[in-house]
């Protein structure tokens, strides 16, 4: 609701949910002697750095890296990694969305960028993208969307998958910082076929569409009713 609202008016409704999590290989972490925290006690930056240090010798035997992480051109980079900036007290624009200078280039954001840089400096991630590094069992961690669960289940069944809470800054204020949101559907008020466009938007953002999106593409539905129609969201720990 919030993402499609402007000046207290609703303009668009999300058709699916595209949360991102920190995926991990249970076997690698077990070999390294690493325990995963619960959602209320996520790893801080310093703690996660120590974890990466512990798993690095294990993945090096597999010719891999502790972290399967890249910064591709496009919306994925800002979507996946914005919570790192937010949990450190940073942001990208001011509250009215009109000012960048002094916000994007803040001290807090520089700290976040330097934290990312430490992954490279310490060899915890590759300098170039390696296709399916995590999926092939050669990385301990990967930040990815909810769709990754289905991809691994179907194409990489040997990966012992787990999902951990997002890593937070050492200055964490206790809030929840995780990518969440959706592609949304809307209709222009000036369209020539408003009635038909309205029906399409209603269906695409409704319960039945959510069920179909889940059945066909394993995209998380955006309505509670569609979620509750499938028992997997209660039975599978990686979907909860």
Protein language model regions, located:
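Extracytoplasmic/periplasmic substrate-recognition and gating elements
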Residues: 32, 107-110, 114, 121-125, ...
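Periplasmic solute-binding protein
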Residues: 2-38, 69-97, 179-187
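Extracellular/periplasmic bilobal clamshell ligand-binding domains
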Residues: 209-211, 225-240
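Bilobed periplasmic-binding protein-like "clamshell/Venus-flytrap" ligand-binding domains
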Residues: 11-12, 56-73, 206-217
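Paired acidic/hydrophobic, glycine-rich loop segments that form the ligand-binding mouth/hinge
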Residues: 140-144, 162
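Hinge/lid segment of periplasmic solute-binding proteins
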Residues: 1-21, 46, 51, 60-63, ...
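Glycine-centered hinge/linker elements that transmit conformational signals in sensory
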Residues: 49-54, 90, 95-127
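Hydrophobic residues within well-ordered alpha-helices
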Residues: 48, 55, 133-141
């Amino acid at each position: 609701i919030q993402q499609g609202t402007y000046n207290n008016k609703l303009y668009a409704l999300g058709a699916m949910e595209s949360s991102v999590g920190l995926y991990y290989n249970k076997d690698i972490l077990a070999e390294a002697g690493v325990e995963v925290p619960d959602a209320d006690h996520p790893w801080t930056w310093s703690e996660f750095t120590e974890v990466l240090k512990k798993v690095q010798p294990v993945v090096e035997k597999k010719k891999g890296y502790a972290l399967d992480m890249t910064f591709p051109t496009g919306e994925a980079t800002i979507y996946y990694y914005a919570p790192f900036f937010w949990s450190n007290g940073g942001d990208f624009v001011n509250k009215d969305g009109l000012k960048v200078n002094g916000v994007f280039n803040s001290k807090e954001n520089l700290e976040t960028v330097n934290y990312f840089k430490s992954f490279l400096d310490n060899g915890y991630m590759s300098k170039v993208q390696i296709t399916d590094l995590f999926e092939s069992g050669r990385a301990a961690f990967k930040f990815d969307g909810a769709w990754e669960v289905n991809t691994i289940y179907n194409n990489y069944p040997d990966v012992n998958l787990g999902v951990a809470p997002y890593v937070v800054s050492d200055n964490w204020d206790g809030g929840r910082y995780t990518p969440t949101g959706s592609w949304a559907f809307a209709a222009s008020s000036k369209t020539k076929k408003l009635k038909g466009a309205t029906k399409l938007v209603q269906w695409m953002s409704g319960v039945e569409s959510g069920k179909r999106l889940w059945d066909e593409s394993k995209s998380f539905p955006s309505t509670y009713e569609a979620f509750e129609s499938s028992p997997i969201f209660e039975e599978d720990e990686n979907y909860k």
